[in-house]
Each structure stands twice: as C-alpha cells, then as structure tokens.
C-alpha cells in the first residue's frame, strides 16, 4: 500500500489539533453517548463503545467524564435522537472527501458541511459519488522505536492485510474490520500499544497535491472539523515530504 505514514503526515497538524482539544472532547463525548445508547454500556459486548473509550483515553479524557457520557447514553434523554450521517464531496484538485457526522439536526449539519466545501473551492456531492474510492479498514499506527519484526509477526498472525514500515521507523497496520479486535488484543497483550487504533476509510488511489492545493485541503478539513457534528474526515489527498515540511513551517511561524 503506497503513501506516507499517517503518523508522519499529521505531525504538522498537532499544534492546531491541540488548540481544538475542547472540540475533540465534545465529539468524543457525543460518540460515547451514542455508542452506549445503541449497544449498551458494557464495552466487552459493544465494540463501538470500546473503540470510543480507547479514543477518549488516548486524548487524556478523565474516567469521570468518560463514565458520565456512557451513563447519559444508557439513560437516553437529550442525546437519544442522534443519527449517523455520511456526506461525500470533492476538494481541491478533485480530491475525494468523505465526512462522517453524528447529528441531532440534519439541516444544520448539511449546511455547515456544504459551507466548508464551498468556501474552499470544493463541492458537496451526492451519496455514492466518492465512497466507491474508499475501503473500510482497521488501521493501527505505531510511533518509531518499536521492534519492527515483532510487530509484523504478531500482526500477520492475527489477520493483518498489509503492513507499512516507514523510513523513520513508524509502522502502520491495515486489516479488515472483522480482525480489528483480534489484532488489537494480540499486540496489546505483547505490550505493543498503538498511537492510534481505529476503523477508517482507506482510499484505493491517492492524488498528489502541490503546496497550494495541500493548504486548501487542510483548510477544508479544519473548517469541517470546526463543526461539533463532524466526527471524522477522510480524503485521498497526498503530500510529499517537502510539502509536509513546508506546511509545518507555515503553521509554526510566530
């Protein structure tokens, strides 16, 4: 599977994401509430809730906040009419973009999503317009410094489809969704903790972007993620190492 490591490609976004910690917590709490409402409050029997809990803990959410969100989901109330909505569209240079939302007001959400596409020169498409370009996969990202042979051996034995080892030592593991929990448990039992572990949408092909289009795509992503309703944004844009470095420099200048 070609492309740059998600670990490497998102380094330049860390400062901006840290500034949005409050919004990230809002999104995670919404997912905790909804997953508990739909599948119950026991993570052992609710994979969606288990994934949401892992994400919450990876962002240093307190157990108290986490447990209150789950309790809200079990109890119903104001969050009981949340629905999952998936929007598809085109970003700069024809990049395919998928936007996963969790909303209690479809009209508000589509208005915010459409506005983000329009402001950055893209356009919101119809259902099915770009989803055929993506495949649902389990994705595990590991920071540099782990025993590569051990990670690869355990992952392949547990059902991994593909493994990428990058020049800096970062590792990405890809699997079909049904093997996600098995791989996660196997590697964690061996003491190998992923930086991120999630079910994601992986593009079958990528579009190389120049600096201008990369900046426009990141602006689109930032605008989408500013909406509390948007949970995840997937795209098939790709940046070279040089452009990633230029973006990092631009975002860190005083």
Swiss-Prot record:
Subcellular localization, as worded in the UniProt entry: Cytoplasm
Gene Ontology CC annotation, any one: cytosol
A Gene Ontology molecular function term of the record: DNA binding
Gene3D superfamilies recorded: 1.10.10.200, 3.30.70.980
GO biological process per UniProt: regulation of DNA-templated transcription
Main location: cytoplasm
Keyword terms of this UniProt record: Cytoplasm, DNA-binding, Transcription, Transcription regulation
Pfam families assigned: TACO1_YebC_N, Transcrip_reg
SUPFAM superfamilies named among the record's database cross-references: YebC-like (SSF75625)
InterPro entries, alphabetized: Integrase-like_N, TACO1_YebC-like_2nd/3rd_dom, TACO1_YebC_N, Transcrip_reg_TACO1-like, Transcrip_reg_TACO1-like_dom3, YebC-like
Superkingdom of origin: Bacteria
Disulfide bonds: none
HAMAP family: Transcrip_reg_TACO1 (MF_00693)
UniProt-recorded name of the protein: Probable transcriptional regulatory protein HDEF_0869
Source organism phylogeny: Bacteria, Pseudomonadati, Pseudomonadota, Gammaproteobacteria, Enterobacterales
């Amino acid at each position: 599977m070609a492309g740059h490591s998600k670990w490497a490609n998102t380094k330049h976004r860390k400062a901006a994401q840290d500034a949005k910690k409050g919004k990230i917590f809002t999104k995670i709490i919404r997912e905790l509430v909804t997953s508990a409402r739909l599948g119950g409050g026991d993570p052992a029997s609710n994979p969606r809730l288990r994934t949401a809990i892992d994400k919450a803990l990876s962002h240093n959410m307190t157990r108290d906040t986490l447990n209150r969100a789950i309790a809200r989901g079990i109890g119903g109330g104001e969050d009981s009419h949340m629905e999952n909505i998936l929007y598809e569209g085109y970003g700069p240079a024809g990049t395919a973009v998928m936007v996963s939302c969790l909303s209690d007001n479809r009209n508000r959400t589509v208005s915010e999503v459409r506005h983000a596409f329009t402001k950055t020169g893209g356009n919101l498409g119809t259902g099915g317009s770009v989803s055929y370009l993506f495949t649902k996969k389990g994705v595990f990202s590991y920071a540099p410094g782990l025993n590569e042979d051990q990670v690869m051996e355990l992952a392949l034995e547990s059902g991994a489809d593909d493994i990428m080892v990058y020049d800096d030592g970062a590792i990405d593991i890809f699997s079909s969704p049904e093997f996600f929990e098995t791989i996660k448990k196997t590697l964690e039992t061996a003491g190998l903790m992923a930086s991120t572990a999630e079910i994601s949408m992986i593009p079958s092909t990528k579009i190389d972007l120049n600096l201008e289009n990369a900046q426009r795509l990141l602006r689109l992503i930032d605008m989408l993620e500013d909406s509390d309703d948007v949970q995840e944004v997937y795209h098939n844009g790709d940046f070279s190492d040089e452009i990633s470095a230029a973006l990092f420099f631009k975002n860190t200048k005083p």
